[in-house]
Amino acid sequence: MMSFEEEQLRDHAVVNLYRIGAIRFGDFILSDGKKTPIYVDMRLVISCPDVLQTIASLIWRLRPSFNSSLLCGVPYTALTLATCISLKYNISMVLRRKELKHPNQEDKIKVEGLFSPGQTCLVINDVIASGRSILDTAKALEDEGLNIRESLVFLDRQVGGADALKEAGIKLRSVFTLEELVKALLSKCQLSETDAAIARTLLETF
């Protein structure tokens, strides 16, 4: 059962993400080409330390019971989240490079930081859609000998990402599903009439 403190953190996150414009309603196209009436832009939280820390706390509450000595944020939006979690909870972090540091050398560096093969690493992300970015990050980490068992995210858009991760042997844990987020927006935020109408229509699709 959710604690009162966690409920407060969730409410704070939703209200403030909408307030700063990180959650918007309208007509948007995702990176995979699919259309959506709601867009969540977590890049804006870097300018709002209190919101960033709230989201980091919510994500960290999802952590599994087994010991994980490392975490890695999916580049690039989740790097700030991962860094915040690392500093707040004193857990080591590694960095996956999307662009290789030495592309013309044999010793191409894919993962930066101090780690040893066999360690377990949690993959942190802000939003999951198809799951491709998490899977790409997991593969880079596994290529270096790290074990990837779970991924923690703020929002699951519920468009197949969790199933894609499951097929790869990775369990997904999310603070919100898209359905839960929309319900929270309707109950906790003072949405404009237009946004509220879009939110109610979106809920009917779940």
UniProtKB/Swiss-Prot annotation:
Keywords: Glycosyltransferase, Magnesium, Pyrimidine biosynthesis, Transferase. Its cofactor is Mg(2+). GO terms for biological process: 'de novo' UMP biosynthetic process; pyrimidine nucleobase biosynthetic process. Orotate binds at residue 157. 5-phospho-alpha-D-ribose 1-diphosphate binds at residues 97-98, 101, 125-133. Its EC number is 2.4.2.10. It catalyses: orotidine 5'-phosphate + diphosphate = orotate + 5-phospho-alpha-D-ribose 1-diphosphate. InterPro entries: OPRT (IPR023031), PRibTrfase_dom (IPR000836), PRTase-like (IPR029057). GO terms for molecular function: magnesium ion binding; orotate phosphoribosyltransferase activity; orotidine-5'-phosphate decarboxylase activity. Pathway: Pyrimidine metabolism; UMP biosynthesis via de novo pathway; UMP from orotate: step 1/2. SUPFAM superfamilies: PRTase-like (SSF53271). Gene3D superfamilies: 3.40.50.2020. PANTHER family: OROTATE PHOSPHORIBOSYLTRANSFERASE, URIDINE 5'-MONOPHOSPHATE SYNTHASE. Homodimer. Belongs to the purine/pyrimidine phosphoribosyltransferase family. PyrE subfamily. NCBIfam families: PRK13809.1. Catalyzes the transfer of a ribosyl phosphate group from 5-phosphoribose 1-diphosphate to orotate, leading to the formation of orotidine monophosphate (OMP). This is Orotate phosphoribosyltransferase. It comes from Chlamydia caviae (strain ATCC VR-813 / DSM 19441 / 03DC25 / GPIC) (Chlamydophila caviae). The gene is pyrE.
